[in-house]
Amino acid sequence: MPELPEVEIVKQGLNQLTLNKRILGGEVLLERTLAYPISVADFLRGLEGKAIAQWHRQGKYLLAQLYKWGKKNSKLQEYENEDGWLGVHLRMTGQLLWVNPEESLHKHTRVRLFFGHNSSGDKDSSNYELRFVDQRTFGKMWGVPPGKEISKVITGLQQLGLEPFSPEFSPKYLNKKLYKRHRPIKTALLDQTTIAGLGNIYADEALFLSGIRPTTICKDLTEKQIEQLHLAILKVLQTAINAGGTTFSNFLNVKGVNGNYGGVAWVYSRAGQPCRICNTPLEKIKLAGRSTHFCPQCQK
């Protein structure tokens, strides 16, 4: 599943390519991709004649702020909802690809949005196309009507913990979230109510960098360990963003390019290989149903 760095990379690409272009229309090839509204006609009606002012990311959610084509977007306030929003969650295998409309259609294409600078709503007159490709079909899209509170429509936003790069995310916050918890630290880090956007790959990586074994019970962590973990989370996420994210199976950026973090990963997907620090063979276990990688020597 794409995690915070991958979704951030997609957001950055979308902000470079899709802003201020008229949405001419669209085509929904798999109706269950739509979480809200479930009517294809209502979903497309909410997008046609709009343009995207800005893409935002909250955890693993992508949120596009819309405005009516022809209206200046310079006065839009962040997260105001005058003309609607488009929400996307890639889930396990979702991809958002910016392509030439003449490019052949991938068999797992679920939604197509047609962009251009003209007034026609015909897909044949579009200059650009945004495709939502999703092999496993778990990905979702939302059309948030004007005036509606975004989190009332995309209800998963209500449960998210802090963004790791927000000023409020601190060792004190992390300690408060983990204090007295009787579950393994790896499991706690995967909980989106603890940290928004952190997932399996970067939880393993951050625990390695902080020297904490994934099975360590939260309540047993010292303040020093929590401080180290806080720094490690920020470091590994920024490193992954700089590398364009991680591609082990399905992740591509909006131009269809793989991420490069996998080649420099400390422990994730490297079971049996030597630790990059001490050369001890790395181990892999199942923890709360998730593959978990660690160094038995460096992580105590």
Curated annotation (Swiss-Prot):
Stored PROSITE patterns: FPG_CAT, ZF_FPG_1, ZF_FPG_2
Zinc finger extent (FPG-type): 266-300
This protein's record includes keyword Ubl conjugation: no
Any Pfam family matching the protein: Fapy_DNA_glyco
Residues that coordinate or bind DNA: H108, R136, R181
Catalytic activity line of the entry: Hydrolysis of DNA containing ring-opened 7-methylguanine residues, releasing 2,6-diamino-4-hydroxy-5-(N-methyl)formamidopyrimidine; 2'-deoxyribonucleotide-(2'-deoxyribose 5'-phosphate)-2'-deoxyribonucleotide-DNA = a 3'-end 2'-deoxyribonucleotide-(2,3-dehydro-2,3-deoxyribose 5'-phosphate)-DNA + a 5'-end 5'-phospho-2'-deoxyribonucleoside-DNA + H(+)
InterPro entries attached to this UniProt entry: DNA_glyclase/AP_lyase_DNA-bd (IPR015886), DNA_glyclase_Znf_dom_DNA_BS (IPR015887), Formamido-pyr_DNA_Glyclase (IPR020629), FPG_cat (IPR012319), MutM-like_N-ter (IPR035937), Ribosomal_uS13-like_H2TH (IPR010979), Znf_DNA_glyclase/AP_lyase (IPR000214), Znf_FPG/IleRS (IPR010663)
The keyword DNA-binding appears for this protein: yes
GO biological process: one example: base-excision repair
SUPFAM superfamilies, per the entry: Glucocorticoid receptor-like (DNA-binding domain), N-terminal domain of MutM-like DNA repair proteins, S13-like H2TH domain
Cofactor field: Zn(2+)
Positions of the catalytic residues: P2 (schiff-base intermediate with dna), E3 (proton donor), K60 (proton donor), R290 (proton donor)
Superkingdom field: Bacteria
Annotated cofactor note: Binds 1 zinc ion per subunit.
Keyword line: DNA damage, DNA repair, DNA-binding, Glycosidase, Hydrolase, Lyase, Metal-binding, Multifunctional enzyme, Zinc, Zinc-finger
EC number: 3.2.2.23, 4.2.99.18
A molecular-function term among this protein's GO annotations: zinc ion binding
Family of the protein in this entry: Belongs to the FPG family.
Function: Involved in base excision repair of DNA damaged by oxidation or by mutagenic agents. Acts as a DNA glycosylase that recognizes and removes damaged bases. Has a preference for oxidized purines, such as 7,8-dihydro-8-oxoguanine (8-oxoG). Has AP (apurinic/apyrimidinic) lyase activity and introduces nicks in the DNA strand. Cleaves the DNA backbone by beta-delta elimination to generate a single-strand break at the site of the removed base with both 3'- and 5'-phosphates.
Subunit-level organization: Monomer.
PANTHER family named among the record's database cross-references: FORMAMIDOPYRIMIDINE-DNA GLYCOSYLASE
HAMAP family, per the entry: Fapy_DNA_glycosyl
Protein name: Formamidopyrimidine-DNA glycosylase
Native species: Trichodesmium erythraeum (strain IMS101)
UniProt lineage: Bacteria, Bacillati, Cyanobacteriota, Cyanophyceae, Oscillatoriophycideae
Gene name as annotated: mutM
